[in-house]
Amino acid sequence: MKKTLYDKIYDSHIVYEEKNNTSLLYIDLHLLHEVTSPQAFDSLRDKNRKVRQPKKTFATMDHNVSTTSQDINASGSMAKVQMQELIKNCSEFNISLYDIKNPNQGIVHVISPEKGMTLPGMTIVCGDSHTSTHGAFGALSFGIGTSEVEHVLATQTLKQQRFKNMKIEITGEIQKFVTAKDLILFIIGKLGSSGGAGYIIEFCGNVIEKMSMEERMTICNMAIEIGAKSGLIAPDEVTFSYLKNKMYAPRGVFWKKALNFWKNLKSDKNAFFDKVVNINISDLSPQITWGTNPDQVISIDQKIPDFSSFDNLIKKDLAKSACKYMGLKIGTYLTNITVDKVFIGSCTNGRIEDLRAASKILKDKKIANNVKAIVVPGSGSVKREAENEGLDKIFISAGFEWRLPGCSMCLGMNKDRLNDGERCASTSNRNFEGRQGRGGRTHLVSPIMAAAAAVYGKFVDVRKLYNGENN
């Protein structure tokens, strides 16, 4: 029987199969952070249980951490308690932890791939929605709730239904100044925020094949915003080259054995997909969200759509509500809209390639007087690499604040947030009401679009930046 990549990984991890299309799956890697794990550990203690596989469990601090100080007191009282609990829990249960003083600390979905913890064919879970990021390596990865965190800690397994298969084949030639972030935003807009519900999405096609691993991670990171359980990309030579000599990757004879296994991790020819979507992106433009959901997105050269263009009443009502919250009107070009803050970072766009791309836009420029801008490297390793390349100096010279690693302004859970009514060009992954702070207005864009907005104090078409049209 021909199998998809998803079915191959799912089937190879079945511990016990039930008749209702649900199985108990073995989990290869369990990632933890300070927010969704404390209750799970408390429950283990209440039931006198141990962590079954501490060496297959890894923790870091990212959601609540201060990006201006490594002092645990700088993050606020609640964050301090959560971080102290994580330190205590990891010590008691013998789990590796990158705390805020560790030079490699950072966002969990940045650390795991860059250290070679994430490997093709794995099952990976974390108490965080954007665990789908790891699917870029051909790993079946998804977010779980706190009760499931407890279950995996105790058993190294998880009960999981079998999802349907969707293939999104992306072809064409991606244009200059159009990025992986623009591509995934476009796909979300095309399919809608529930278009992937009930599916695991495999991304493929010549565009994906040409992407770096960091670009692929951006794609899979936001698969959840289509409503999918996760996203997958089959591993290839790009994957293997990225992983070679990483800290936790196999070495020597084990590397050769791993390669032999990984090279077979792809969907069989003529494998059945429940849904197939073909997208040609040769004419794709830089994208920007205008509403309060990632699927409310347009090209930078388009107007906010008329409510009558939506095909059902629910979408019309959501669009009206979004425009009201965002302080926008239909028919408006976002290039006429000023910004208050710019955020470059997150598990979507906080890697070294993202910082390099943004720094090229900012070199020898200054940000607008009306803008406060911060750049937050996704990990200590990313921060050091950027500093070794002199990127920090470019950002600082332009007027950005160069911060410590963390989730930062992606979510209003730490001290980096928007004030009521402030508008932000953000490289993060969600733009819900209040996501970056109560009353804050979030526009999702690529790192280069965010950098350009910082320079001009408003949204601009980055393609025109070097043509003298945004003066």
From Swiss-Prot:
Pathway linked to the protein: Amino-acid biosynthesis; L-leucine biosynthesis; L-leucine from 3-methyl-2-oxobutanoate: step 2/4
UniProt binding sites for [4Fe-4S] cluster: 347, 407, 410
A GO MF label: metal ion binding
A GO BP annotation: L-leucine biosynthetic process
Pfam family, one: Aconitase
EC number: 4.2.1.33
Keyword Cytoplasm in record: no
Keywords from the named record: 4Fe-4S, Amino-acid biosynthesis, Branched-chain amino acid biosynthesis, Iron, Iron-sulfur, Leucine biosynthesis, Lyase, Metal-binding, Plasmid
Top-level taxon of origin: Bacteria
Job of this protein: Catalyzes the isomerization between 2-isopropylmalate and 3-isopropylmalate, via the formation of 2-isopropylmaleate.
Family affiliation: Belongs to the aconitase/IPM isomerase family. LeuC type 1 subfamily.
Quaternary assembly: Heterodimer of LeuC and LeuD.
PANTHER family xref list: 3-ISOPROPYLMALATE DEHYDRATASE, HOMOACONITASE, MITOCHONDRIAL-RELATED
Protein name: 3-isopropylmalate dehydratase large subunit
